[in-house]
Curated annotation (Swiss-Prot):
GO CC term, one of those recorded: cytoplasm
Residues given in the record as a divalent metal cation binding sites: 109, 113, 130, 294
Biological process per Gene Ontology, one example term: tRNA threonylcarbamoyladenosine modification
Keywords of the record: Acyltransferase, Cytoplasm, Metal-binding, Nucleus, Transferase, tRNA processing
Domain of life: Eukaryota
The name this protein goes by in its record: tRNA N6-adenosine threonylcarbamoyltransferase
Catalytic activity: L-threonylcarbamoyladenylate + adenosine(37) in tRNA = N(6)-L-threonylcarbamoyladenosine(37) in tRNA + AMP + H(+)
Reported function: Component of the EKC/KEOPS complex that is required for the formation of a threonylcarbamoyl group on adenosine at position 37 (t(6)A37) in tRNAs that read codons beginning with adenine. The complex is probably involved in the transfer of the threonylcarbamoyl moiety of threonylcarbamoyl-AMP (TC-AMP) to the N6 group of A37. OSGEP likely plays a direct catalytic role in this reaction, but requires other protein(s) of the complex to fulfill this activity.
Effect of a null allele: Mouse embryos display primary microcephaly characterized by significantly shorter cortex lengths, cortex-midbrain midline lengths and cortex widths. Mice do not show a renal phenotype.
Length: 335
């Protein structure tokens, strides 16, 4: 019954998780929060991660009721993500692996989300909608790869929402996306915004540029409220995501859809995806913020699968990479 310790820190969340044979034993997390109207810089984020990571490690072991002797493998996020935060966490993972004399595993962040989603929901072979601040992909498993059927051709949907939040100076606590979701519930008017779907791919830069340019003017003239803009942006970008996911499901003949990534916590997105799945006679799987948002347990779970399949990452190959596509990884642990 191997136990795997996972380190995640590819963006403004840092987490340390422990997983043993499909059971999450611990999953503490911290978030680097900046002032309204601002984003988070790589260097500042890395400093935050370095300041809290050892406390999180101790917290995870205590919560799991384990010691270093009980851990069989150390997993960490190899990429994709922001360079400085990734590097700061990878250094700790390598150090711990050497001090404890444990094997090391570099995990693809995207695959961590997928494997955690499969574990928590019980989805068998779903079409995956992976939506976060740095990634937007529609994925399906085939022949030992997670194949990307569609994706953003510019910025991620979460990045679009985060940057819009800066325009309205919406709070980043607990996250701009969550606060947009709450404001959208009070929106009453649907403002027409650019809708850009190109086959299986989507584009969010145009809708962001439009709303950045028009927001203050529309608010000043009383044409709409901030809540209306939040509502309109959500409805438009989520409709785009539902469209390309349905197209992928039709192509694959899939009867399961799984939403993963931080934006996947959004209940309105889950509602729209659920309606689409119901109309197709399919089933929707999603998790709550404990497992949708970046966390250490997802890296531990993917690491556990890789460890069981015989994967190891030599120290010389453990450098982080900011660009690490989902379909680069050979998924040897699935049939």
């Amino acid at each position: 019954m191997p136990a795997v310790l996972g380190f995640e820190g590819s963006a403004n969340k840092i987490g340390v998780g422990v997983v043993r044979d499909g059971t999450v034993l611990a999953n503490p997390r911290r978030t680097y929060v900046t002032a309204p109207g601002t984003g988070f810089l790589p260097g500042d984020t890395a400093r935050h991660h370095r300041a809290v990571i050892l406390d999180l490690l101790q917290e995870a072991l205590a919560e799991a009721g384990l010691t270093s002797k009980d851990i069989d493998c150390i997993a960490f996020t190899k990429g994709p993500g922001m360079g400085a935060p990734l590097a700061s966490v990878a250094v700790v993972a390598r150090t711990v692996a050497q001090l404890w004399n444990k094997p090391l595993l570099g995990v693809n962040h995207c695959i961590g989300h997928i494997e955690m989603g499969r574990l928590i929901t019980g989805a068998v072979n779903p079409t995956v909608l992976y939506v976060s601040g740095g990634n937007t992909q529609v994925i399906s498993y085939s022949e030992h790869r997670y194949r990307i059927f569609g994706e953003t051709i510019d910025i991620a949907v979460g990045n679009c929402l985060d940057r819009f939040a800066r325009v309205l100076k919406i709070s980043n606590d607990p996250s701009p996306g969550y606060n947009i979701e709450q404001m959208a519930k009070r929106g009453k008017k649907l403002v027409e915004l650019p809708y850009t779907v190109k086959g299986m791919d989507v584009s969010f830069s145009g809708i962001l540029s439009f709303i950045e340019d028009a927001a203050q003017r529309m608010l000043a003239t009383g044409e709409c409220t901030p809540e209306d803009l939040c509502f309109s942006l959500q409805e438009t970008v989520f409709a785009m995501l539902v469209e390309i996911t349905e197209r992928a499901m039709a192509h694959c003949g899939s009867k399961e859809a799984l939403i993963v990534g931080g934006v996947g916590c959004n209940l309105r997105l889950q509602e729209m995806m659920g309606t689409m799945c119901q109309e197709r006679g399919a089933q929707l799987f999603a998790t709550d913020e404990r497992f949708c948002v970046d966390n250490g347990a997802m890296i531990a779970q993917a690491g556990w699968e890789m460890f069981q399949a015989g994967h190891r990452t030599p120290l010389k190959d453990s450098a982080i990479t900011q660009r690490y596509r989902t379909d680069e990884v050979e998924v040897t642990w699935r049939d």
